[in-house]
Amino acid sequence: MSTAAPAASATNSAIPAQKEFSLPPSTDTVSVPVNRKKQKRRQKQAARLAAERQSNGHISPDAATQNGSSPAADPEGYHSDEFGDVDQEQLSNGDANHKDDQDSVDAHDDYQYPGNGSEGLQKPTGRKSKKKKGKKGPNGTHAPEDETATHASTPSVSMSHPLPPTLPSHLGPRPILKPAKTRSIWNTSTQEERENIKTFWLELGEEERRQLVKVEKDAVLKKMKEQQRHSCSCTVCGRKRTAIEEELEVLYDAYYEELEQYANHNQGSFEKGPPIVPPPRLYQPPLRSPGQHTRTQGQFHPSRGRIHEVPEEEDDDDLEEDYDEDEEDDEPYSDEDSDDEDDEARAARADFFAFGNSLTVKDGILTVADDLLKNDGKHFIDMMEQLAERRMQREEDTQYGIAAAHQSLHSGHNHGPFDEEDYDEEEDEDYDSQEDEDYEEDEMDTMTEEQRMEEGRRMFQIFAARMFEQRVLTAYREKVAEQRQQKLIEELLEEETRNEQRNAKKAREAQKRKDKKKLQKQAKEEERARREAEKAAEEAAAKAEQEKKLEEQRKKREEQRKKKEADRKAQEEERARKEAEKLRRQREERERQAEVERKQREEKKRREEARRKEKEERELREKKAKEEQLQKDAAKAEEAAKEREKREYQAKRTSPFSSNQHPQISSSPVAHSPHIQSGIPVVPKAPTPARPRQPSQQDSHTSSPHSQPASTDPSQASVSPRSMPISQSSGASSVASKHVHGLHAMFHQPQPSAPLSPLGRSIPPGFSAMNGLPPGPPGLTGILGRPPMAHELPVYPPHSGPFIGQFRGYPTPNGIPAAPGINGARAMPPGRGFPLESAHGFPFHGQQQIPGAFSAQQSGLPHGHSRQPSGSFERSPLEGQTQPMPISRPSPIKRPSSTQQDQRKNGDRTAQRDVDDLSAHLGSSALLDDTDVPFASTLSQSLPGATAPGPLPGPARASFGGPSLFPDPLSTSGWSNNAFGSGVHHRAHTSRPVAIRLLVIQACKQLNTMSPFKGADGFHDVSLVLRQVEQLRPQNEPSISLKEMLDICDTEGSTQNGGGSFSTKKDETGEFVKFEPDNNSAASGHRGSIVPGEIGSPVPSSSLPAFGGIGTPSVLRQFSSPPMGF
């Protein structure tokens, strides 16, 4: 069976009603066999209703049968019962368990219809009459309002009968809805919901009602077939269900054809059966009184509980129950609705078995006759209530039948037990089969085709009524939902309006507060402006007072400045006067010096002339004396050699350490000529005792050459060995005298001025020969043995222990002085495998004697002043060290004073020159002018406790054993071999920036000296200066970058970093730098002002620094610290 009904019609089936037709037309005519039980029950019910109608004054059953009028039902009762209960079930608990047929039977016994204000009358007594409850009310007639309810569908309608009386006023329709202001759509009670449903139906128009009760054919058939989904699917049940569906289709099609014929011809009948309208007897019982409570179910049941039912009716029960289960969630329609009702019975309920007459089919749509929809639809509502009662009565009959057949329910089937409230096709089949067995003899052919068609029509009528009921309820609830939605929207709009009003109020209040704050702020601004104006006035007054004070102070400062300016001008004038006086003195001094030099030159010419004459005479005398002296000297030499060998032999046997303290011979630091002079014979004289020197001659700063007449005595002048003749033709006498003088001078303490000849000098007693070698040949006692060669070991190995260096006396190897009496021989630097060279063909090796062995002044100690000590002895040519002295103005070139006559002649000049030297070297700072800047002190003056230099030099190339101009590069000695002082060892403690600045200053000075032309402005290329600085930089120092040098040039000069300032300039050729000295620069000192290459500058030192590297430059020595050891 196909279903093609619209969805709206399928879902809006909402009309509760049931209708069943009874086939027997009357008790008189029994044409076909029927179900006797149902027939008896229906007959009894019809008789009861007819009696009730007659007792209440209604029309007779015959009249009712003739006209077939449909009495009106109470619309309140319908809504109070069916719709109200359904809605209560949905809204309150949602319980849709409407399958309990037994409960439905019990509940139906005491079912009452409240809401009409009448008491229900008790039903006739029956099996369950004791459960009935009812209320008695006033009696009254209940006449149908519309007697034409079945005019169009009943063929035996008589239009001549009068209309039944109208309903009383208390039974008429009354408004149930409360006023809109008092009622609520959100929370409604059950009674209010029932009233609202009833009012909703009454408010609908005729067209709207017609649209609600329209049901499509396919929708009804679809609903019927859907009831079979939950039944058993076994073979037996499947076959049974298939047969039932086929029969349902046949019945449905036949029913629809009959309805269509009836709609077209206003009447119709089956070809072989009774007409579609039920027999008139069903309409004979009059309507009950309003207060009567009718029991619609049959009062009698078979003694064994077996009821013979046709399969269609049983299948209708199952379909009806299943349909209720499907609609359980959405639109529950339960038989238990009657269980929840109170005892108030509904009055005036008609027996609407003529519902089938009102069903029509138009264009395939099942609908209700128009007369049921007119007159506010009251007839339709009453008819639906009556159909519902018929449905419950039929369910009760089915319940008893199933209970009787329950014993053999599962005899040939494997199904589980079924609940009392659930029945399917198998139960009906078993029930039917058992009924067939029980009534096999007399009821085998009770069901005819007409009966089956009648039952089918009744089943379809029930379905249609229920679908109508559902549609009405659904439409009501849609309306309620729409009302609630609209109410919600209105409430939301009201809430939004209230919020907007509240926000507007808040905005107004905020604006008021803002305006108030603005006024307060404006008042505060005015107050602040007033205070600021007062404060500005006070500040202006204070400022005026302050300006007045500042003006006074400015005037005072101006006066002070003018006063200071006048004082400065006076000082400048005084300084200019002193400068002019100074220049005048200097000019006079230069004139006087020029006069003295002129006189000296004249004196020199006279002295040279006299010396030449004296020389000629002396040569003649010496020539004669030499021959005699040679013979004597040879004999004395042999004699002396034997005695010396004897003494040496004895000295070797005794201890070499002698406790005798040898007198030290002081040497004079008078400069000598570096050139080899021709030998001039000196007449030997007896040594005269010399006056001992006073300590003031060395330590006093205020002494002058005039206070030392002995220093200029010609008898105390030392004889330089370079001025002596080397030839052996001078005679033995002179040699012998020299030897005697040498020995006598060594041990004669009061006569330190006796010269020691380097040729006749012998080893003192108690001292062994140098390096353990025997002394030289006779006549050459002063010549030491050869130095050790490369394969020989020196007397003291290099780097010997420093413990003996604490004693005074002869220095040991590496410059450490040893105790008196210890052999002072010094070892030669190891690894030197070649002999020393001599200068100018002299057959003497360069082994140096011990310098200053008998010196009166300990070398290395600082002098009291930088002036040259006045001594009568010249320094020995064999000494490797000269006394450190400051470099002064170079003296005029003159002949060396090698003879006593020259010294005697030049005595006055020497005294005058000493005065000049004193003025250049000495003098107190108090005698200087205010503008004079005192000389920077030298190292020996500024650093107290300066010690002696390092070790004595080793063998070096020299002429006549003297120091050479350029020392041996292999020498590790710290003693300088030049004639301009020694390279003093001082560990540099200056910082790197200061050292770099000093190197840059020295490089600039050297570049100034080496300038190729006179017109140089003093600017030098920075790359050239950097190259020169790199040459001067010690090797153990890191390299200097150009940027670092330029950064150092930007520093300000001071006494620590060399003073002066640097000027830089840039052009297209490059960048140039220039050094400009000032009073703090090294140029103001007498030692630091000498740049290598200038006149009087010393030869660069070859000594090594204390901790390695190349010798420290002379400029850096001024700012170095004393050594930390020795």
Swiss-Prot record:
This is Stress response protein nst1. InterPro entries: Fungal_stress_NST1, NST1. May act as a negative regulator of salt tolerance. One of its GO terms (cellular component) is cytoplasm. Keywords: Coiled coil, Cytoplasm, Stress response. Residues 1-192, 266-348, 404-453, 492-774, 823-914, 939-965, 1075-1126 are annotated as: Disordered. Residues 311-344, 419-448 have a biased composition (Acidic residues). Residues 96-111, 492-512, 522-651, 902-914 have a biased composition (Basic and acidic residues). The keyword Lipid biosynthesis does not apply. It is found in: Cytoplasm. Residues 35-45, 125-136 have a biased composition (Basic residues). Pfam families: NST1. Residues 479-655 form a coiled coil. It comes from the Eukaryota. The keyword Coiled coil applies. Residues 1-17, 727-737, 886-898 have a biased composition (Low complexity). Residues 291-300, 655-670, 694-721, 846-860, 867-885, 1115-1126 have a biased composition (Polar residues). Belongs to the NST1 family.
